[in-house]
């Protein structure tokens, strides 16, 4: 097994390799003075890119430092000698691997092919040169780089021109021979060449004129811009010049795409408008049909119903398919026949109050009518207020501040049948009774017993009674007259009763007025 290279040999090899212009910048990012190397690719990297290569894994890239690591093997040195940034850049450009994504770049097929190529070249160099320090045939290079030598001016000036013309300007400089010939011009290489070969004396065999003529040719050939043309060290990874035609093509494509988007938006808007117009047309047709139906219903009405419907505008313009139409719901409210009279007309005549008017008849949906509970309450509290005849069929007295009952149209009152003939017998019989029973009303009691009971009830609130009052003397003055208010209720009760009736009448008038106004406002809006 061959011995490992020494530290001096490693430094000499990397000193010579890093002297190449393409190896003075990072292969990935172009940073100056890279001090790390990727052995599978033979390229030089900066410290940041070396960290990225470590994250890829050793199966893709193996990183070592060119300054700190001293355990390099001959195979690793051969990989760096046969590789280089220039050859790697040319290979990747040739195979289209110009992406800036490191992960995608080194996982590509091109990177795999280049790794295999570097491995084959390194194995060939190992088998051919063994442990020789250089693989280009120049064995007069540095053997002891630590020893300082004086520079030979004549050797620098009379160097054979073939060494500079080994690679023409038009030939690709991706081989190792180009790298070797480019690095000979450095002072360190010149010193190493003169270490064993000695100073050159060829200058003595040439004329001064020829020597002077050689100098400008060397300088001119040294300044040939071959590196800028073939190596592309400052161009990055596959950068290409963008022409004005590419910009115009991109602009044209963008304009075409914009026109397509505008056409699509216009088509969508047109479809939405058409659907909206069709739906509005259908809705208008439905409204016309509903309106015609309402007009037909209005024409079928007669008399004042039609006038009221036209005045209120009920059901003539339905706003939607579910609009409410009062025209279809108008009907005559028939008057209920009262079962019994709740109060006596003669008793109400005693209350001369302007707020009492004859109100409308009792309807089924009238929330303000005086029901049986109201009259029964006064029948139990008053002394003789409940002596009215329940068989009398008469309209109920209600409070209304809007329109008197006598002013209401006659077509509102349609009794179900002819009222039964009134009978004054029950009224005259129970006129002075405070309370009666069904047996008393239908005559199932004895007349004498009834008269005695009625007298006792009549005299129960008196301070003093006489025999005429008790036995019913017909000559008595206080029993010979008609019904008086004193016989019905005491004076104090009459006063309280009047005040209560006035307050209730006022409240009922206000409530009835508000309800009627709200109903008119509501129904007139249709």
Curated annotation (Swiss-Prot):
UniProt topology in membrane: Peripheral membrane protein
Zinc finger (C4-type): 26-49
Region named Disordered: 159-180, 354-426
GO cellular component: Golgi membrane
Region (Required for interaction with coatomer): 97-526
Coiled coil feature spans: 247-314
Segments of skewed composition (Basic and acidic residues): 405-416
Transport found in the keyword field: yes
Keywords: Coiled coil, Cytoplasm, ER-Golgi transport, Golgi apparatus, GTPase activation, Membrane, Metal-binding, Protein transport, Transport, Zinc, Zinc-finger
Gene Ontology biological-process annotations: protein transport; vesicle-mediated transport
Arf-GAP domain residues: 11-127
One Pfam family linked to the record: ArfGap
Subcellular location: Cytoplasm; Golgi apparatus membrane
GO molecular function: GTPase activator activity; zinc ion binding
General function of this protein: GTPase-activating protein (GAP) for ADP ribosylation factor 1 (ARF1). Implicated in coatomer-mediated protein transport between the Golgi complex and the endoplasmic reticulum. Hydrolysis of ARF1-bound GTP may lead to dissociation of coatomer from Golgi-derived membranes to allow fusion with target membranes.
Subunit relationships: Interacts with the coatomer complex. Interacts with the C-terminal appendage domain of COPG1.
Protein name per UniProt: ADP-ribosylation factor GTPase-activating protein 2
Native species: Xenopus tropicalis
